[in-house]
Amino acid sequence: MASESDTEEFFDAPEDVHLEGGDPIGYPGKVGISALKETENSAYKVGNESTVQELKQDVSKKIIESIIEESQKVIQLEDDSLDSKGKGQSDQATASPVTAGTELSNIPGLLAIDQVLQEDSQKAESQDVSEETELESKQCFPSDDTCEKPVDETTKLTEISSTAQLNVPETVTEVLNKEEVEVKESDVLESASSHSLSTKDFAVVEEVAPAKPPRQLTPEPDIVASTKKPVPARPPPPANFPPPRPPPPSRPAPPPRKKKSELEFEALKTPDLDVPKENITSDTLLTTNMASESTVKDSQPSLDLASATSGDKIVTAQENGKAPDGQTIAGEVMGPQRPRSNSGRELTDEEILASVMIKNLDTGEEIPLSLAEEKLPTGINPLTLHIMRRTKEYVSNDAAQSDDEEKLQSQQTDTDGGRLKQKTTQLKKFLGKSVKRAKHLAEEYGERAVNKVKSVRDEVFHTDQDDPSSSDDEGMPYTRPVKFKAAHGFKGPYDFDQIKVVQDLSGEHMGAVWTMKFSHCGRLLASAGQDNVVRIWALKNAFDYFNNMRMKYNTEGRVSPSPSQESLNSSKSDTDTGVCSGTDEDPDDKNAPFRQRPFCKYKGHTADLLDLSWSKNYFLLSSSMDKTVRLWHISRRECLCCFQHIDFVTAIAFHPRDDRYFLSGSLDGKLRLWNIPDKKVALWNEVDGQTKLITAANFCQNGKYAVIGTYDGRCIFYDTEHLKYHTQIHVRSTRGRNKVGRKITGIEPLPGENKILVTSNDSRIRLYDLRDLSLSMKYKGYVNSSSQIKASFSHDFNYLVSGSEDKYVYIWSTYHDLSKFTSVRRDRNDFWEGIKAHNAVVTSAIFAPNPSLMLSLDVQSEKSEGNEKGEDAEVLETMPSGIMKTDNTEVLLSADFTGAIKVFINKRKNLS
C-alpha cells in the first residue's frame, strides 16, 4: 500500500505546479473569445469587488486621471479600425449580451496602452523572459503552436497577452521585490480564470465601462501599467498563492513497510548473529561452570538455561496474530473448535470420525474415518510422513521384491546358467562348485522366513514388542559378517567392503526409530521414534563429564521451576538410568564406543517423534506428531518449554549461529521462526500452492537462508532476516515417472561449497548448486518411495549415507573419483556401496561427526580414569570435526523399523 500512495503523490505534483503558475496554457494565444467565458470572468470580478476597492484606495487620483485621458486618445485613433473586428468577434459567441460586445470593441486600445507603458521593461527583460517561457512551456504545458489561431489584425494583442503571461514567473521568482508584489496580486486573479485571453486584458475592458458600478475596475489596468514605478509597499493579500514548485524529481521506490514482528526480530538481532564460528567452537565441551551457571557473558550468542526456563512453559503458535501481509487472523488464534450439529450440540469423537470419508485410491472404495484403522493398511500415518507402523507385510513385500531384483542382476552376470537357478537350487547344494552360492541363497531365504514370522508375531502379540527380550532375535544376523554389495558395473576398488559392526544398541526402542542426531561435539547421540521417548546415548569416555553436570543440578536445588508429572516420570527414568549405566556395562566389549544403556530418557510427547535438533551448548529440540516441539537440556531431567503448533511438526532446526532461535515446519503449511527467550513466534510465513504440507526444513549458508521441503517436491528458500520468499527449486526429473515432484524428506547443507543435499520419495538424492540452482549430482540406487528417510554427509563431506526400504545402508562418494571412472556422466552417481546388517527397513543412517573420539577407546578410557575429567576431551577437540582427514576411518550408525541401532567402524585403505 505504501508504494501506491507514493505513486499517487508523484503524479499529483505536476498538477499543483500547473495551478500555481498561472493560466492553464492550453489557450495562451487565442483571440476569438466567447461571451460565455466573458460573463464568467465578469461574475468572478464582481465577487472580488472588495479586493479591487482596496487597490483603488492605494492609488492616487492623479495617476488614474492621467492614464484615463491617454487611453481615451488612443481609443479615438484606433476605434474606427478595430470596431468592426471587435463586433464580428462578439457576434460569433452565442448568447452574448450587448454590453459584452461594447467592451470587446475597446480591447485593442486598452492593450495598446499597456504595450506603450511596458515597452521599456520589455526591452530589458525580453531575453530572460523568453527563456523562462520556453522552459515553462516545455516542462509543464503543451506547445503554443498547437492551440494558437493566427489573426492578422490582433498581432499586438497577441504580443501584449504573451508579455502579460511572461511576467508571471518573473514576479514569482522575485518575491522580495516590492514592485513585484502587485503583479503577484494580479496573478491571483489570472490563476482563477480559464479563458483564452489574459485576465488583465479583461480587467481593462470591464473598468472602461462606467455604466456598471459592480465593474468599476478601471484602476486595475493602471496598476498593471505602473508596476514598474515605485509604489508604497503593502502586505500581500491573504489570497496570495505560494510560488510554484518545480516538478518533483524521480525518486526510488521506498522500502516496504516492516511488520511489528519483523522490527522486534531485528531489535533482538544483536551482533551475535555475526559472531565468527571460531569464537564458539562446536567441538569443545562446555566447562562445568558454563553449564551450571549458564552466564550470558560466556554464551551471549547462544541460548542459556536462565532464558530457556523463564516465562511460559507452554507456548502457542499465535504468530503475533497477524498474517504475512499484516492482516489480523482471528480464527487461527482461537484455535480449532469442535464442530456442532444443526441443533447446536457439539459432536462426539465417534460422530466426527464417522462424518469424514476416506477414499482408497487403489480400489476407489470410500469408508468412514472411524473404520479406516481396520480397513486400511495399518502403520501408515495420516499424512504419509513415515512408513508402516505396526505390520511389516508391505515392507516385507517390497524387500522381497528388491531382493528378487538383486538376484536377477546376479543371475545376469552369472555364467553357469542363471535362469535355471531357481529350479536347481536344491541340487546345487550338493555340488562343490556351488556351495558358496547355496549358502548365500539359504541365508537370503532364511532371513525372509524369519521376517515373515516376526511380522505375524508382532500382529498377533503386538504388546510383546515392549519386552526387551524381543530384541534378542535381532542378534542373529550379527553371528556372521556384515553383508556387502555394490552397484552393477562398479568393479571397485571399494571403500566400505571391510566395514564391521562394533556395537548393537537394540532392546531400548520399542518400535521404529525415525530420527537420530549427533551433538555438535560428537559425544552424544539422540534417537527417537515410535515409542514417544527421546533417548540420549553417551560415549564411554564422556559419560562421567555429563553425569557430573547433571548431578550438579540435582544437588543444587533444581534451578528450574516445578516440574510437571511427566517431568517427574522422566526424572525417575533418568536417575535410574544413571545409576544402572555405570554397572551394566560389558567389560569384555571394549570396542563398543557407547554405553549400552542410554544416558537419559526424555518423556513427555504423546505421539511419534519425527525430528531432533541439537544446539552447540547441549540444548535439544524434539518435534512430534502430537503437534508440539519440546525443549530439553542434557543437564536437566524435565522439559524446559513446550511450543504448540496447529498440526504435525515434521522438521525443526536450531539457527546455526544464534541458537536462541529455531525453525519449525508443520503440516499446516507454515514456517515459523521461534524466539526461545521471549517464548513467541518471531517471524513466520506460509507456503503457497495447493499442497501446503511442509515435510522438511533446515538452514543453509550458515543461517542466511531457511529452506523447506514440501509434499509436492518443492524446495523453497526464505531469507532468515525477514523470512521472505527468495526462490525455489522444483525437485523432479525432466521425464519419466519421476517428472512429477515427490515428497521431500530431507535437506542437508554442504558447508563451504554453497550446495544442499535434497532427499525425496522418488528414490533419488540430488545435490544442488545454490549459485545458479543447477543440479550438480544425482545419486540413485536406494529405495525410498514412502518413508521419511533422509541422506547426510560424512564428517569430511567425502561421502553421503542413507537408509533404504530394502534393509540396506547405501553409501556414495560425494564426487566421482576420476581414477576409478573415466567415461561416466559427471552429474550422475550410480556407483553405490551397500551394507546389510538389519532385517527391517533402515529408517535412519548417519556418520559420526568426530570419529576419532570412538577409536582406541580402551586407551582413552585408561587416560580419562587417571586424569581429570575433561582434560583429555579438550585435547581431542583441538581440531575441528570437519577437517579430520588424517586417518581414513569412518564411524557409521544405522537404525531400523524394529528399533535396533547398529554401530559400524570402517577403516579405509590408505589413499595414494
Curated annotation (Swiss-Prot):
SMART domains: WD40 (SM00320). The keyword Membrane applies. A motif (FFAT-like motif) lies at residues 9-15. It is found in: Cytoplasm, Cytosol; Cytoplasm, Perinuclear region; Endosome membrane; Golgi apparatus, trans-Golgi network. Residues 89-104 have a biased composition (Polar residues). Phosphorylated by ATK1; the phosphorylation stabilizes its interaction with RAB11A and RAB11B. The modification Phosphotyrosine is found at Y478. Coiled coil: none annotated. Residues 1-14, 466-475 have a biased composition (Acidic residues). Residues 2-170 are annotated as: Binding activity. The modification Phosphoserine is found at residues 3, 50, 66, 71, 81, 96, 126, 261, 341, 343, 402, 469-471, 560, 564. Interacts with the GTP-bound form of RAB11A when membrane-associated. Interacts with GRAF1/ARHGAP26 or GRAF2/ARHGAP10; the interaction connects the endoplasmic reticulum (ER) with the endosomal tubule. Interacts (via FFAT-like motif) with VAPA (via MSP domain) or VAPB (via MSP domain); the interaction connects the ER with the endosomal tubule. Does not bind to other Rab and Rho small G proteins. Downstream effector for Rab11 which regulates Rab11 intracellular membrane trafficking functions such as endocytic recycling, intracellular ciliogenesis and protein export. ATK1-mediated phosphorylation of WDR44 induces binding to Rab11 which activates endocytic recycling of transferrin receptor back to the plasma membrane. When bound to Rab11, prevents the formation of the ciliogenic Rab11-Rabin8/RAB3IP-RAB11FIP3 complex, therefore inhibiting preciliary trafficking and ciliogenesis. The FFAT-like motif is important for interaction with VAPA or VAPB. This is WD repeat-containing protein 44.
